[in-house]
């Protein structure tokens, strides 16, 4: 009996971004390796998104539209999409996590990543995820460590494949460890999931050639100094979720000591150090950071702070 080739199942989460969804679907239509199946998860239950999905049905051999009753955030949307997808998938298939505002660049990228995934699965049967790039986790500081430019060749072992990096997740691994953790709502979704896969004994890899090309195109080569800045930028809702989720993740992985360090230094120390130079902004950070720290320590998860109504990237 001849086994069928692994299929590609895409999951695309969106919230009030019809123009970007159209661009992303158009890009998927132009891919040399078309998706076998695409599940669009609409957190806004927007008829315009459903209409766009019908218009770009050629983006995949089979396209499905899931309307959510409420905004579950990116993470909750991916969780819903993964749960829906595994029901009709084989263990050897891949689930490709897509972004609604960052279409795949180049018509060959899905084909290249599929080939890379097959190669890594042959070399390392515990391969659970491949993608363009990602990062490694510093458990001592509770921070992401940037992979140096000099490492960007061949297969790069990672702790997680980043957002907007076209993560290919093996269905067998998704079934074993579960989908994304929707409690996070937004922020550090891929980090938590990658760490969960690593804890289960799985491997994750970045594609050095694609990653180097992506950094070069973005003008981000020769930027290996990832030391944190002492200055505060204007507070946005995303910062709340990043801090809350970091504390939650550290506690969930039995690193409460690092969670305390993050709380004291990142949550309170940095805003206090900026009180003189930027009092209004520092006070906003202090107020929202205190809330994020409280929620991260008490497991108050989900959508606890409302996102901005309009994204800066919306047209």
Question: What are the roles of these predicted feature ranges?
Answer:
Residues 91-101:
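Short beta-strand-to-loop acidic/aromatic patch adjacent to the donor-nucleotide binding site
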Residues 17-30:
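Short, well-formed alpha-helical segments that are part of the catalytic scaffolds
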Residues 251-315:
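Non-catalytic, C-terminal membrane-associated alpha-helical segments of glycosyltransferases
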Residues 68-88:
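Glycine-rich, basic loop-to-helix element that forms the pyrophosphate-binding segment
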């Amino acid at each position: 009996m001849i086994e069928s080739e692994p299929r590609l199942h895409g999951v695309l989460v969106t919230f009030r971004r019809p123009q970007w969804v159209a661009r992303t679907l158009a890009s998927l239509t132009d891919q040399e390796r078309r998706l076998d199946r695409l599940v669009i998860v609409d957190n806004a239950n927007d008829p315009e998104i459903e209409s766009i999905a019908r218009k770009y049905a050629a983006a995949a051999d089979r396209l499905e539209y899931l309307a959510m009753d409420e905004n579950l955030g990116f993470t909750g949307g991916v969780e819903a999409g993964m749960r829906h997808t595994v029901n009709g998938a084989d263990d050897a298939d891949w689930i490709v996590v897509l972004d609604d505002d960052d279409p795949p660049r180049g018509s060959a990228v899905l084909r290249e990543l599929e080939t890379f995934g097959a190669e890594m699965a042959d070399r390392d049967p515990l391969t659970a995820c491949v993608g363009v790039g990602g990062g490694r986790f510093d458990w001592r500081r509770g921070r992401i460590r940037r992979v140096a430019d000099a490492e960007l060749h061949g297969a790069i072992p990672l702790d997680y494949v980043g957002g907007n990096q076209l993560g290919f997740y093996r269905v067998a691994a998704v079934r074993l460890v579960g989908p994304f953790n929707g409690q996070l709502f937004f922020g550090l979704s891929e980090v938590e999931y990658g760490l969960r896969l690593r804890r289960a004994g799985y491997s994750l890899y970045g594609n050095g050639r694609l990653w180097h090309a992506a950094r070069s195109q973005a003008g981000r080569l020769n930027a290996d100094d990832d030391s944190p800045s002492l200055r505060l930028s204007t507070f946005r809702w995303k910062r709340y979720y990043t801090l809350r989720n970091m504390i939650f993740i550290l506690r969930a992985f039995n690193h409460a000591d690092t969670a305390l360090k993050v709380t004291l230094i990142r949550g309170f120390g940095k805003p206090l150090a900026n009180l003189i130079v930027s009092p209004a902004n520092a006070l906003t950070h202090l107020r929202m950071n205190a809330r994020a720290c409280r929620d991260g320590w008490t497991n108050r998860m989900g959508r606890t702070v409302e996102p901005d109504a309009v994204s800066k990237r919306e047209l």
